Amino acid sequence: MIPATPSVTDRPSELATDISERLNRAISEHLLSAFAPDNTKSLRLFSAPEAAELLGVSGQFMRKVHGEGTIPEPKDVRAGRRYYSAQELWEARQILEKASRTKGRYVPGRKEGERLQVWQLMNFKGGSSKSTSTIHLAHYLALNGYRVLVVDLDPQGSLTSMCGINPEIEFDGLTVYDAIRYDDPVPFSDVIMPTYFPGLSLAPARLLLSEFETESAVNSNPDQPFFLRIRNALAQVEDQYDIVLMDSPPQLGFLTISGMAAATSLIVPLTPSMLDVSSTAQFLELAGAYMGVIEDAGAEL
């Protein structure tokens, strides 16, 4: 339980630390309750009509392939009705794809010669739904059979939390920072972890990622400048995914710019208000100027 008594310290530093500890304790208790009984985030089951729609087939076709034994029965069958887990749908896709005469009919991933798509969601404004848009887009793509990697570039770790991991309370593993730091970076594959969502992997973030901003300001490595570090990290795993989505912090710092240099497309969410539209216009003007500087430094965008 969270202590009901007020903090007794008068020192601002100790007061801030005490409030932080109380909030983290409250979050931890809430997650234990929300993700009971095994403290793991999970995905709901899908009805037979939903499963057919996601696979792009008819209900009659689903009954046919079950009757023929082409795909196995789901574990959850109630009153003659089938309910599928996302993992069962993912496995059904692979089976149907192998049996299909049309390549890509059920697993629509990259075709030979197609480059990895890297989409960065970014904006100056906090609260513009960057993280929310990233996770919903990732879920949609994974449910439709794409191999998706989400990369959390925000030290706040909101996207990481949406994937079922509280970065500052229950997670002490490797993060994006460990793969792009200047001293002894680890392979990017060591950072990536599976999520509760089949087809979706995560490169998580913690507050430590903010160190990249400080390090980039004082380091100059001509062999691997700051704006190429995320691109080079993604190149290590590009054959394992169809699409990469990057969630950016609400600023044009070194992390965001490094993500821009790696991206094939930029997505700029904004809310429909004059202040947000004005801020977005300023953001894009500054982003264009920074991209020009990166291009002049030799990067191909």
For the regions a protein language model found, what residue spans apply to each?
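P-loop NTP-binding core
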Residues: M1-E50, L54, Q60, K64, ...
